Regions:
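Glycine-rich phosphate-binding active-site loops on the catalytic face of alpha/beta enzymes
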Residues: 74-89, 256-268, 308-326, 362-395
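Catalytic cores of alpha/beta
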Residues: 67-70, 244-254, 288, 294-312, ...
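Catalytic beta/alpha-barrel core
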Residues: 80-85, 109-111, 131-135, 176-178, ...
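Active-site-adjacent beta->alpha loops and helix N-cap segments on the catalytic face
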Residues: 85-95, 141, 156-161, 206-226, ...
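Bateman/CBS regulatory modules and CBS-like beta-alpha motifs in cytosolic regions of diverse proteins
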Residues: 27-51, 58-60, 89-129, 134-137, ...
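Short beta-strand/loop segments at the ligand-binding rim of alpha/beta enzyme cores
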Residues: 48-57, 103-108, 228-237, 278-294, ...
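Alpha/beta catalytic cores of nucleotide-metabolism and tRNA/nucleoside-modifying enzymes
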Residues: 1-21, 109-112, 177-178, 184-188, ...
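Surface-exposed amphipathic alpha-helices with a cationic face
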Residues: 44-48, 73, 98, 121-125, ...
């Protein structure tokens, strides 16, 4: 006989947080939103990979490309580059994110002394970089002979065939730093000598890295930015359960910090096989999340299969119609509460803490705080990020209002059959997502800052200044339908102006 749940499943909108005691220290400026991204053992100080803010962007064509990944990493979160594209294109997006943040940056713009000004212009157009290293063999491993920047030539006054050796700044006139120079030392040299870039060279004169002034300035503007050990922006990437043997190595080679199996339903042998392949080939060196699941059994299955984090949620996304088309899913709040309990049980039994990601169901900013209070370590958002300048879709004018295009990975437009495949050879038989618009909201930075200030303020109302204490001490109440109505404006006539809901 089928199993019947005795209680209905609930959404975030059916809950509220009850205030706790607010001490003098409970102010937004004192709140830390740092949170684990991947699993760790009891006794470790923290997770091998952590987020500075509990927000990650969804594995979607209309959300997570390299531009949004850089913008989110600057704020302290991470993007998962969408996998519904060729292996080569996804790896290239990852590589662009890793090369964007310049702590110690390997040079990807190199020419030999015999190259011409036209070669410089072509390379600049291809890479977007204006600093070109001139090396003995034209590669990043060659002996550094000089540097060309846009100040060394004038297109309107020079023959495109002019050799770079005639207008480059030669090595003997360059200010360089030796191998082993720290980032602080490099930045001090840049400031003392008023440089835009500083080459780091080996004892035998080979170019190792560049350090750029612009990255120091960006760091000052973005103190929470999420960086790896080489001071590069961190980025994740989505994979599927079909071509993982080819895709995973390419993404690892490109520098992806973490992977995530992208599927509408993760309690399957296909995810187990994908996790097994990664563990057998890479051990624990490659971090990979799995999902999505909505109950204790699903979490346990993926945790035991080796997942570094588990995503929770089926059918709760704004463009997802899995519940409508297949009758599969669960209210996001109920799913999250059960999986969080399973996560804590697993930790008590094994000493291994497997973070959980709440994916879907976020409509208002306060839902973020509720999700964290209910046990989520971080939150995956699609529609939220799709509204911003940095998302990859077009901004269009619809009925006098600016909108951004937004479509689901289960839609016919995405044609991402790998995400919804059950192991057969057929393609997309029916859609589990829609093609739509979302209201344009402007730049990511100011919107994320506004949302997170609300989260921090609510945490202070609950009497806590970090996420673990919120999960431990929050008081959450289920509310009636009339309580929900009472919580909004009522019995007044609004003046005609825009509202701030997203």
């Amino acid at each position: 006989m089928a199993y019947y749940y005795s209680e209905p499943s609930h959404t975030f909108s059916e809950y509220l947080l009850v205030p706790g005691y607010t001490s003098p220290d409970c102010i937004p400026a004192n709140v830390s939103l740092r949170t684990p991204l991947v699993k760790f053992r009891k006794g470790q100080e923290e997770s091998p990979l952590s987020l500075n803010i509990p927000l990650v962007s969804a594995i979607m064509q209309s959300v997570s490309n390299d531009t949004l990944a850089v913008a989110l990493a600057k704020e302290g979160g991470i993007s998962f580059i969408y996998g519904s594209q060729s292996v080569e294109d996804e790896a290239a997006m990852v590589a662009r994110v890793k090369s964007y943040k310049a702590g110690f940056v390997p040079s990807d713009s190199n020419l030999s002394p015999d190259a011409t000004m036209q070669d410089v212009l072509d390379l600049k157009k291809r890479t977007g970089h204006s600093t070109v290293a001139i090396t003995s063999d034209g590669t990043s491993q060659g002996k550094l002979l000089g540097i060309v920047t846009s100040r060394d030539y004038r297109v309107s006054r020079m023959d495109p065939a002019t050799k770079v050796s005639t207008f480059m700044t030669p090595f003997e006139r360059l200010i360089t730093a030796p191998e082993g120079t720290t980032l602080k030392e490099a930045n001090d040299i840049i400031w003392d000598h008023k440089l835009n870039s500083l080459p780091i060279v080996s004892a035998d004169g080979r170019l190792l890295y560049f350090v750029f002034r612009k990255d120091y300035e960006q760091h000052k503007e973005n103190p929470a930015e999420l960086l790896d050990s080489q001071k590069r922006y961190m980025v994740g990437a989505g994979i599927n359960t079909k071509d993982y043997e080819k895709r995973v190595p390419a993404l690892v080679e490109a520098g992806a910090d973490v992977l995530c199996i992208d599927s509408s339903e993760g309690y399957s042998c296909w995810q187990e096989q994908t996790l097994r392949f990664i563990r057998e080939r890479y051990g624990d060196s490659v971090k990979v999340g799995a999902g999505n699941v909505v109950d204790r059994d699903g979490f346990r299955f993926l945790a035991e299969a080796g997942a570094d984090f588990v995503k929770v949620g089926i059918g709760g996304g704004s463009i997802c119609i899995t519940r409508e088309t297949k009758g599969i899913g669960r209210g996001q709040a109920t799913a999250l509460i059960e999986v969080a309990a399973a996560r804590d049980e697993y930790f008590a039994e094994t000493g291994i803490y497997v973070p959980i990601c709440s994916d879907g169901g976020i409509v208002h900013d306060y839902h973020m705080t509720l999700a964290l209070a209910m046990g989520a370590d971080f939150i995956m958002l699609g529609r939220y990020f799709a509204r911003f300048d940095e998302s990859p879709t077009n901004r269009v004018l619809v009925n006098g209002q600016y909108m951004k295009e937004y479509w689901g990975e289960g839609s016919n437009r995405a044609r991402n059959w790998q995400r919804y495949d059950l192991g057969g050879g057929t393609g997309l038989a029916f859609e589990e997502g829609v093609d739509s618009y979302v209201t344009y909201a402007g730049p990511l930075k100011e919107n994320v800052a506004k949302s997170l200030y609300k989260v921090k303020s609510t945490m202070c109302n609950c009497g806590v200044t970090n996420i673990p204490n919120l999960q431990k001490n929050a008081k959450i109440t289920l509310v009636s339908a009339t309580s929900i109505v009472e919580g909004g404006y009522h019995d007044v006539v609004l003046k005609a102006h825009g509202n701030s809901q997203h």
